[in-house]
Amino acid sequence: MTQRAPLKRPNAVYRNFDEVKVDDYLTDVFTEEAVHFIQKNQHRPFFLFLSHITPHTPLQTIEKYSRRYEHLSDKRARIYASMVASLDDSVGRIVKELESLGLSENTLIVFASDNGCAGYIEGACSNAPYSGFKRYHQEGGIRIPLIMSWDNFLPRGQTYKQPVITLDLYSTFVAAAGHAGFSTIDSVNLIPFVKEEVNSSPHKYLYWRSGPPYAIRDERWKLMRYSVAPYTARDLGNDGRLTPPKGGWPHELSSEKITLLYDLKADPSEQNNLADSHPEVVKRLTTEYETWASSLAKPMIPAIRSTLADIDGTTVQLIF
């Protein structure tokens, strides 16, 4: 088997291993590539994963989108809204193509994000009413849109309220392809739950871990722990990050840490830390998390990206 050399310019645009010169707005370019892929494969089963760069930094737009938001006085917010508009148009363009080819009744469409709005873009977007941002385990960092559409198969206009995770898309896609009995420890087929064929919740617990900081939640409660930072803003570089030690940041919490417990049903904005008043919940969730964490393989790649954040009045270290 012939192996190709590593990409010479990782931030360039490639088709397979060949660099492509792109002059147009990248969102539009990716959209047209996706439409072409659908047209080419319309007579056979296909899987299309379209991972748009927008609205990631750097914040950039073009006139056909920005003119829709001339009424916004803040430049960053105007550009960000324009980028979201380009994303919205992309989804519409792809859905329209599926409909025009008569594929919408046989195609599962999923729209999702990887994280919430980033705090470092200074007010261009908001996660309100949720707290936290990208890189955080607060709801503002991990609670994202998840939209599923499948004409004449999934119910329209329904809101599914049980906690799920994007890992579930793996088993869901496999089931949609005809292997409904397939499942893994981490991934659950969501189709029978969304169709209300199953009354239980897909998960008893959901877990997040990024270096030492972690979170675990059940249907009601959410527990988080962060290491208290032995650093200040003066230790941050020009990129807003801490310089990692040799070998990377530790994978375990420091001896000085904060514990946060929130009742997400009563307090989805995570404003009232109930850790001290509900020690039994803290203990239960801690035990569940530690059992899960002990089953994981040790990280192969050192953690080198880190910054500081103020959470519940304490400066903590985020690792991402």
Task: Give residue spans per PLM region.
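Structural recognition of the beta-strand scaffold that forms the well-ordered cores
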Residues: 47-51, 108-112, 146-148, 165, ...
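Formylglycine-dependent
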Residues: 1-45, 52-61, 81, 230, ...
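Substrate-binding rim/cap in mid-to-C-terminal beta-strand-loop elements of soluble/periplasmic
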Residues: 4, 8-18, 92-100, 126-184, ...
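A structural signal for well-ordered alpha-helical segments within the folded catalytic domains
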Residues: 28-32, 78, 85-89, 164-171, ...
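Short, solvent-exposed turn/loop segments enriched in Gly/Ser/Thr/Pro and often Arg
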Residues: 49-60, 111-117, 186, 209-211, ...
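C-terminal, low-complexity/hydrophilic appendages and adjacent surface loops
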Residues: 138-142, 208-275
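Active-site regions of oxyanion-processing enzymes, predominantly non-cytosolic
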Residues: 26-68, 95, 99-108, 139, ...
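Core domains of carbohydrate- and sulfate-ester-processing enzymes
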Residues: 1-16, 56-62, 120-144, 221-247, ...
